[in-house]
Every structure is written in C-alpha cells, then in structure tokens.
C-alpha cells in the first residue's frame, strides 16, 4: 500500500547580526523631577537637556556590560568600613524581570568591590562586568539605576541644585540640608563660564560670590565631586 508523503519546506532562519552601543549615564543629565536617578535614552541622539544620547537603537538587547566608575560617599556612609562586606550592588528597575535574586528579596544586575579613592569618593570595580539576558529585552528606553549594599538602598548627595541670587549681597545662596560641601569646594554655575569656589558654609546655607548679574530662574549649580557617570555597553541582535 502506497503511503502519501507530504513534503514541507523548512522555514528559513532569519539571519541576524550583532550591534554594539555604548552610553554613559551621567547624573547631571538625569530626567527632571526624578530622584535619585532616572535616565531617558534617545536613539541616534546627543547627550544633553536631560537626555542620554545613544549612537543607534537599543532593541533586542542580549547583553549588558558595565565598567569601573566612581561614586561619592552615600549619605548613609562615613567611612569605607561602613560598606558591609566591601560590596555594592547595582539594579536597573526597568529590567527587574531578568535580574539576580539574592537574600531578603534583593535583586541586582551587577556586584562591585568598593575601593577607597579619597575622603569623599570610592571606586566601584565590577566583580563580573557582564550580564547576559535569558530573553532579549525588546527595547531599552529608560534606565533607573538603584544602588544597594546589604543594609539597603543607598542615597547620594545632590550633584545639581537650583540657586537663588541675593540682589543685595550679590551672593548666590543655597539653603539646602544634608550636603557634603565645604568652603573652597569647586562648583560650576550654568550661564556663567567661570569656575567658582564656595566662599562660606553656614547654617545649612552655601554662599558663593556672584560677580556678574545673574537671573535665579536660569541658574543651576553643578557639583563635580557628587557627579556619577555609569559607563555601559549593550549588545543587540538585529534581523537582516
């Protein structure tokens, strides 16, 4: 008895190529109104105006790599020994479905060794700087990094502040609390090209001599020693 054989053509596999994208998450370009950190990534754009520019698109992401970077001492820490186990963990909120789960429900993507650099900064050295996703991430548009140690989330001193100009004394006054600034610290002022130093810190107010006339509405103060820049590298799959 003859058997009927139905032949089917195998579906051809889609060829794919890998694309590589670098980006630098700069705390001075975080999204407005999002504290402590949240970033918007713009494909084929430039970094600036609260946007992190990326050379290409971040779709079908299969691997993420992080490189060493520095952070200021968190508000909860005073000495290097305050970092429990000498480790800090980094978790990206938008990628929570694919993250390492640890004790007490903590999740993270990267683990770092904490290395002292100065009295107010430490360097984070990745223990394993690559994270491979089990399933490709369809698109990365926003990233919200959260730092932990075994005691809980870490908060950092502000690196960008809005200012008030006293028209009588011609000083810039910053009525803020929990800052880590001292007399002589260098700061940058938007709308004014010269580097300034803090003249006085008193009663939770920082005074900076203002030489040219400045408008309070247009001024922001940038504090270099509190700046955090996270260098990332992404590998994506693209169908061709």
From Swiss-Prot:
Main location: virion
Keywords: Late protein, Virion
Compartment list: Virion
Induction: Expressed in the late phase of the viral replicative cycle.
Entry GO CC: virion component
Record's function text: Forms the penton at the fivefold vertices of the icosahedral capsid. Together with the minor capsid proteins (p17, p49, and M1249L), forms a complicated network immediately below the outer capsid shell, stabilizing the whole capsid.
Similarity section: Belongs to the asfivirus H240R family.
Protein known as: Penton protein H240R
Origin species: African swine fever virus (isolate Tick/South Africa/Pretoriuskop Pr4/1996) (ASFV)
């Amino acid at each position: 008895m003859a058997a009927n054989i139905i032949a089917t053509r195998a579906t051809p596999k889609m060829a794919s190529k890998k694309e590589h994208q670098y980006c630098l998450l700069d705390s001075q370009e975080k999204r407005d109104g999002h504290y402590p950190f949240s970033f918007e990534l713009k494909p084929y754009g430039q970094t600036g105006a609260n946007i992190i520019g990326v050379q290409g698109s971040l779709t079908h992401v299969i691997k993420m790599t992080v490189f060493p970077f520095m952070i200021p001492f968190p508000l909860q820490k005073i000495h290097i020994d305050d970092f429990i186990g000498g480790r800090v963990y980094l978790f990206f909120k938008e990628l929570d479905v694919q993250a390492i789960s640890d004790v007490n429900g903590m999740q993270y993507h990267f683990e770092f060794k904490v290395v002292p650099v100065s009295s107010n900064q430490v360097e984070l050295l990745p223990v394993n700087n690559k994270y491979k996703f089990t399933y490709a991430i369809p698109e990365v548009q926003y990233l919200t990094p959260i730092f932990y140690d075994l005691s809980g989330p870490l908060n950092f001193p502000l690196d960008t502040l809005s200012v008030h100009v006293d028209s009588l004394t011609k000083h810039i006054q910053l009525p803020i609390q929990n800052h880590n600034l001292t007399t002589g610290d260098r700061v940058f002022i938007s709308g004014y090209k010269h580097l300034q130093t803090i003249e006085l810190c008193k009663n939770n107010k920082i005074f900076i001599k203002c030489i040219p006339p400045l408008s309070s509405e247009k001024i922001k103060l940038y504090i270099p020693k509190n700046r955090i820049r996270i260098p990332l590298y992404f590998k994506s799959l693209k169908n061709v």
